[in-house]
């Protein structure tokens, strides 16, 4: 569960929201108030923090926090 908490902290900081709002079901645009630029910057911050590359075609499929957690779990470098 530590991975979720790390991701949660990055998202909360990047989007300037309270960490309690960052739940697996929370959608970046609808629930967390992100715009398209916020999402791009968030993806870049997550790539840097977790050592993963999130291609544009994958990034377009990432709608909520749970999507990010699953992608990073599946692709994080050991």
From Swiss-Prot:
InterPro entries registered for this protein in UniProt: ACP, ACP-like_sf, PKS_PP-bd, PP-bd_ACP, Ppantetheine_attach_site
GO biological process: lipid A biosynthetic process
Residue numbers of O-(pantetheine 4'-phosphoryl)serine PTMs: 36
Subcellular location: Cytoplasm
Pathway(s): Lipid metabolism; fatty acid biosynthesis
MF terms (GO), sorted A to Z: acyl binding; acyl carrier activity; phosphopantetheine binding
GO CC, alphabetical: cytosol; membrane
UniProt-listed Pfam families: PP-binding (PF00550)
Homology family: Belongs to the acyl carrier protein (ACP) family.
Biological function: Carrier of the growing fatty acid chain in fatty acid biosynthesis.
Name under which the protein is recorded: Acyl carrier protein
Natural source organism: Helicobacter pylori (strain ATCC 700392 / 26695) (Campylobacter pylori)
